[in-house]
From Swiss-Prot:
It comes from Streptococcus pneumoniae serotype 2 (strain D39 / NCTC 7466). The lineage of its organism: Bacteria, Bacillati, Bacillota, Bacilli, Lactobacillales. It catalyses: UMP + ATP = UDP + ADP. This is Uridylate kinase. UMP binds at G54, D74, I135, G136, S137, P138, Y139, F140, S141, T142. The gene is pyrH. Pathway: Pyrimidine metabolism; CTP biosynthesis via de novo pathway; UDP from UMP (UMPK route): step 1/1.
């Protein structure tokens, strides 16, 4: 087997990825399917961390727009990400992968506190680490959490696993049949063109820390493995290609 392109990765999953066809809540069978995909890659010696959104359970911005205090709304969303992390950790444990959940908000009864050195040791020992509760502060997305934690653990790449979306396009392919898919982009392209892959804070963090970002369709079996081994199945964003006009 060829050598992997990425040896330490952070997988960013949306909360909706755990919801299955319903789109809300948590579908255990869907989580178990994702866990098996991750386990297959982990068994090849790849070091893996995860950040999971909370949009299947709660969205802070709409709640704030409806009149809820924005800070409280965001903290509520952080707790949703912890729920998702615990469910995913259980599914990974059930397929034989030693997994730890670390949270940016202390809740010792259910998870470890986030400690960078401890997270690195877990990865080096072959454990998967799931980062929950965002960065512990309101106003920051789980995209920013993914970029920050990827930088802190010195990940080679962030894998943006999307539901039914196979990359980045110049327009919404569901609405525009002429939409063109980008195979490669620079982080600068993403920022300058306003492409909504991640929010601007997350994009800048990824660029400044030279972390590749790969956007791919997670609904096709084996795609995480394909990305890790360098197959060009989605859109790769990095600092190392020629600038696009």
């Amino acid at each position: 087997m060829a050598n992997p392109k990425y040896k330490r990765i952070l997988i960013k999953l949306s909360g909706e990825a755990l919801a299955g066809e319903r789109g809300v809540g948590i579908d255990i069978q869907t989580v178990q399917t994702i866990a098996k995909e991750i386990q297959e890659v982990h068994s090849l010696g790849i070091e893996i961390a995860l950040v999971i959104g909370g949009g299947n359970l709660w969205r802070g911005e709409p709640a704030a727009e409806a009149g809820m205090d924005r800070v409280q709304a965001d903290y509520t969303g952080m707790l949703g990400t912890v729920m998702n992390a615990l469910v995913m950790a259980d599914s990974l444990q059930q397929v034989g992968v030693d997994t730890r959940v670390q949270t940016a908000i202390a809740m010792q009864q259910v998870a470890e506190p986030y400690v960078r050195g401890r997270a690195l040791r877990h990865l080096e020992k072959g454990r998967i680490v799931i980062f929950g509760a965002g960065i512990g502060s309101p106003y920051f997305s789980t995209d920013t959490t993914a970029a920050l934690r990827a930088a802190e653990i010195e990940a080679d790449a962030i894998l943006m696993a999307k539901n039914g979306v196979d990359g980045v396009y110049n327009a919404d392919p569901k609405k525009d049949k002429t939409a063109v898919k980008f195979e490669e982009l620079t982080h600068r392209d993403v920022i300058n063109k306003g492409l909504r892959i991640m929010d601007s804070t997350a994009s800048t963090l990824s660029m400044d820390n030279d972390i590749d970002l790969v956007v791919f369709n997670m609904n096709q079996s084996g795609n995480i493995k394909r990305v890790v081994f360098g197959e060009n199945i989605g859109t790769t964003v990095s600092n190392n290609i020629e600038e696009k006009e």
